[in-house]
UniProtKB/Swiss-Prot annotation:
It comes from the Bacteria. This is Protein-L-isoaspartate O-methyltransferase 2. One of its GO terms (biological process) is protein repair. It catalyses: [protein]-L-isoaspartate + S-adenosyl-L-methionine = [protein]-L-isoaspartate alpha-methyl ester + S-adenosyl-L-homocysteine. Catalyzes the methyl esterification of L-isoaspartyl residues in peptides and proteins that result from spontaneous decomposition of normal L-aspartyl and L-asparaginyl residues. It plays a role in the repair and/or degradation of damaged proteins. GO terms for molecular function: protein-L-isoaspartate (D-aspartate) O-methyltransferase activity. It is found in: Cytoplasm. The gene is pcm2.
Length: 211
């Protein structure tokens, strides 16, 4: 899996501007046990560099995309991170190795409950899982140094921009459901203005909930 991630990073360096990912991110990708986050029938494919179904019409993301999004977020040890779309909990686990605290929201109750139990069992004590609509963020713990959205939105949710700290970064796929979307890097400048940059074409499940 790690060799495949490295190869894809090289292949996409023209689009992403990244000939290599942060060594800390790659170390964590090699450490987090992906097999703990996939259903039993997907275990033979757990370490393939591909998305896998986890039930309820959702997927665990391709490891390369998890690594890229984590790298783009530039998470530091003291940071507080918000994730929208817990899914299996895999991305949250990766972020938990790099951040002080991870707050993650899942709208599909069975997935959220399973992820919470799984993360607790694996000892990720700095991750909190909430059931709810991630479009509105988690204002109680805002502002966040980084926000990762793991489902495609038709636009960048204004509540998430508000909850992003000045100097913070949001990584989010934007575009129509079930079509090719653009992975976007959203940066909130020190003066409160926002700049965006397209990183890479991607295909994510759609963000659900109220708009």
């Amino acid at each position: 899996m790690m060799e495949e991630i490295t190869a894809l990073v090289r292949e996409t360096r023209t689009e992403t501007g990244k000939p290599a990912l942060d060594e800390r991110v790659m170390a964590v990708m090699g450490k987090v046990p992906r097999h703990e986050f996939v259903p039993a029938d997907q275990l033979p494919r757990a370490y393939q560099n591909r998305p896998l179904p986890i039930g309820h019409g959702q997927t665990i993301s391709q490891p390369y995309i998890v690594a890229l999004m984590t790298d783009l977020a530039r998470v530091e040890p003291g940071h507080k991170v918000l994730e929208v779309g817990t899914g299996s909990g895999y991305q949250a686990a990766v972020m938990a190795h790099l951040a002080r605290a991870v707050y993650t929201i899942e709208i599909i109750e069975p997935l959220g409950l399973q992820a919470r139990q799984r993360l607790q069992k694996l000892g990720y004590d700095n991750v909190q899982v909430r059931l709810g609509d991630g479009y509105h963020g988690w204002e109680e713990h805002a502002p966040y140094d980084a926000i990762l959205v793991t489902a495609a939105a038709s636009h960048i949710p204004p509540p998430l921009i508000r909850q992003l700290k000045a100097g913070g970064r949001m990584v989010i796929p934007v575009g129509a459901a079930f079509m090719v979307q653009q992975l976007m890097l959203v940066e909130k400048n020190r003066d409160g203005t926002v700049s965006t940059r397209q990183i890479l074409p991607v295909a994510f499940v759609p963000l659900t909930g109220q708009r």
